[in-house]
């Protein structure tokens, strides 16, 4: 796992087309913005896991 430190307003790149920007920090919550092409799905982990479970692709702890 790559661990990075970013300040509010700073961005990191994933490949050539995906950017992740720190929008704000409030207490223990971080707001981030993700800019990705329309053909790249972006989900919170819990939503992704629900989608995979509905497809029958994932069992708990197996992703």
UniProtKB/Swiss-Prot annotation:
Source organism of the structure: Vibrio vulnificus (strain YJ016)
Record InterPro entries: CsrA (IPR003751), CsrA_sf (IPR036107)
Subcellular location: Cytoplasm
Role noted for this protein: A key translational regulator that binds mRNA to regulate translation initiation and/or mRNA stability. Mediates global changes in gene expression, shifting from rapid growth to stress survival by linking envelope stress, the stringent response and the catabolite repression systems. Usually binds in the 5'-UTR; binding at or near the Shine-Dalgarno sequence prevents ribosome-binding, repressing translation, binding elsewhere in the 5'-UTR can activate translation and/or stabilize the mRNA. Its function is antagonized by small RNA(s).
Cellular component aspect of the GO annotation: cytosol
Annotated GO biological process: mRNA catabolic process; negative regulation of translational initiation; positive regulation of translational initiation; regulation of carbohydrate metabolic process
Protein name: Translational regulator CsrA
Chief location of this protein within or outside the cell: cytoplasm
An annotated Gene Ontology molecular function: mRNA 5'-UTR binding
Quaternary structure annotation from Swiss-Prot or TrEMBL: Homodimer; the beta-strands of each monomer intercalate to form a hydrophobic core, while the alpha-helices form wings that extend away from the core.
Pfam families: CsrA
Family: Belongs to the CsrA/RsmA family.
UniProt keywords, alphabetically: Activator, Cytoplasm, Repressor, RNA-binding, Translation regulation
